[in-house]
Regions:
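Iron-sulfur-cluster electron-transfer modules
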Residues: 25-206
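Ferredoxin-type iron-sulfur electron-transfer modules and their immediate structural context
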Residues: 1-41
Length: 208
């Protein structure tokens, strides 16, 4: 019916839209789907599923379409981010190590305490055992925009939340999902889940 295409952010890009993509899949045009760059334009936001009266999961088809592309030919940026996340148990797509993360968090926290007296008692715990919340953080903040971590700390502090980061599994992003690399996607999720379990936290709060 085309409802899926009406609200799709990627509709019309590369002469493709969700309805056309679905029809191609129905007609068995796997080679054409795999050759189309549109599988990488789709953000898999699920808006088409919400609009579809039959609730057809087009993003799942997009995911399968991505898997038809040889791994080395998938988009270089997210491919490298996936591979980088596999180098450390931090799961950071920017390659930040456990030591890097701890240094940045402690340095930024010290500055906030010194310059903002109303937050002199604020904490940004790392590896606190049996905290209620295990909080993930996107790698971009500690690596390139460390001050952007502070608003979340303030919210958690003012809410009286019992929370912690972990030196392992702290990175919130998972580019292996977007590259449609299921084994490594699962590896990263399991690494993060183990970090939560090892600290005895009750809730994994993924900020992505």
């Amino acid at each position: 019916c085309g409802s899926c295409s009406s609200g799709c952010p990627a509709s019309g890009i590369g002469d493709m839209d969700p309805r056309k993509f679905l029809r191609m899949a129905l007609l068995g045009m796997e080679a054409e789907i795999a050759a189309s760059p549109w599988v990488w334009f789709c953000s898999m936001c699920m808006r088409c599923v919400h609009a579809c009266p039959m609730k057809i999961n087009i993003p799942q088809l997009v995911f399968y379409g991505r898997q038809q592309v040889p791994r080395e030919k998938r988009p270089k940026g997210i491919l490298q981010s996936c591979d980088m996340a596999l180098k450390h148990d931090t799961c950071s797509a920017m390659g930040a190590s456990e030591e890097d993360f701890r240094f940045v968090v402690e340095d930024v926290l010290a500055e906030v305490r010194e310059t903002q007296p109303e937050f002199r008692d604020m904490e940004a715990p790392i590896d606190k055992r049996e905290a209620i919340l295990f909080v993930n953080q996107n790698s971009r903040e500690p690596v390139t925009e460390p001050d952007e971590m502070v608003p979340l700390w303030k919210i958690l502090y003012l809410a009286g939340a019992d929370w912690t980061y972990g030196t392992k599994g702290w990175a919130a992003e998972n580019y292996c999902l977007f590259i449609a690399d299921e084994p490594n996607w699962e590896h990263i999720v399991r690494t993060k889940a183990k970090a939560v379990d090892d600290l005895g936290c009750k809730v994994w709060l993924n900020t992505e």
